[in-house]
Amino acid sequence: MQRSNARSRSNINSDMVDPPEVQTSPGNHRSSPSTAAKPKSKRTKSIIFVIVACVTIALGLLFIGYSILRSGRNRRVSLHYSVIIDGGSSGTRVHVFGYRIESGKPVFDFGEENYASLKLSPGLSAYADNPEGVSESVTELVEFAKKRVHKGKLKKSDIRLMATAGMRLLELPVQEQILDVTRRVLRSSGFDFRDEWASVISGSDEGVYAWVVANHALGSLGGEPLKTTGIVELGGASAQVTFVSTELVPSEFSRTLAYGNVSYNLYSHSFLDFGQDAAQEKLSESLYNSAANSTGEGIVPDPCIPKGYILETNLQKDLPGFLADKGKFTATLQAAGNFSECRSAAFAMLQEEKGKCTYKRCSIGSIFTPNLQGSFLATENFFHTSKFFGLGEKEWLSEMILAGKRFCGEEWSKLKVKYPTFKDENLLRYCFSSAYIISMLHDSLGVALDDERIKYASKAGEEDIPLDWALGAFILNTATATFDYSGKSRKILDLSNVAKYKI
């Protein structure tokens, strides 16, 4: 319409007046309508092309994202789940494991996608005076596990609670009261659960579980027995020693684990009360008792506490005999900070019951311990203390002595400046821990200070699998096996032709 109107006006005016001539410079030519439309058309096509390309790319990304989410969801749905709650002495940790079944065999993958854990403090044994109090922490751990298990798999996923040394120290009636509360929580969790799946496990079983996961991680499970790796654990309430021994081991310390055509004769024992925390408490009590037997009040030097630390503990202890009705014993704990004396005191404590030994050899107390054979991994507090001091992997026991001497002999005020983020109760442990480790491994078990066959570790293998006994328990409970325990066979593990491993 506009174009036609323009033409009519032009015709009328041409009859009356000749149009003026317009002079323009070469650079100021006006574009005709036809020439102006060409670049406009090109710009329009370019814009359309860009829009189409962006939409195509966006749709492609959406499709890829949807495919990934769908495949991830399908993988999660295809997973099977197992949950283990580790009732340790210092805290309670839940482990959530995901695994697949391929050709009727479980495939384990301890990567981040298929493994999660959460730890809460304190441990179950802290509720000895209030068993009902354990309900809250166990419930929180259960909720954590439920969020990591596909809803459709919840009822088919087993959940187990395995309590260790902290609970073993309690009287049996108290243990049962705490376990009954946990069973009530687990029954209503929605997971597959049976009452017998909440229990206090033996220290020997704990050691075997740790041995299994270590050798699984190292790829030696299924190989020659003498090429496997032993485990020495230093927990809070107990210490475990487990390894293949060629010696004749008394039945109470012997475990036979069958793996296909390979049979492993294991020595496994848990030294209850000889974990790091329990041992330090035991040593302090011994110092107090020595002072109580000699005087009514006084100063008790503790060589395992760094110099300059001020701690006044009024220990109200009934005196024995005729002094019992005369008063109470009040002692002041004084930091002596001497590594050598702390080491000697720890060694004396480890050897206290040696006079009662009825075996050909007892390394710790009256407990039979064969000569250590093969390579070993020292875990838990062996690892934590070594990392704290920044020890090297070679000759770390020799380095531990030097580090312990420096730490124990340092003034407390200087240690606080050097380690400002550490709480007092945590920082105080390392003087005793360094001396205790040497007195246990070197002085008692006979490990040479330069022996490179024993290394401290928290993970093992190319994939850095955590050296947590709960992972070994998961492997044993998921697969099917024959585990000979003191002459009695029970189904726990059969890894040959049953489970294949993908880590």
UniProtKB/Swiss-Prot annotation:
InterPro entries referenced in this protein's UniProt entry, alphabetically: GDA1_CD39_NTPase
Subcellular location: Membrane
Null allele phenotype: No visible phenotype.
Keyword ATP-binding: yes
Cytoplasmic side: 1-45
Membrane disposition: Single-pass type II membrane protein
Glycosylated residues (UniProt): 261, 293, 338
EC number: 3.6.1.5
Membrane topology, Extracellular segments: 67-503
Superkingdom to which the source organism belongs: Eukaryota
Function: Catalyzes the hydrolysis of phosphoanhydride bonds of nucleoside tri- and di-phosphates.
Designated name of the protein: Probable apyrase 4
Record organism: Arabidopsis thaliana
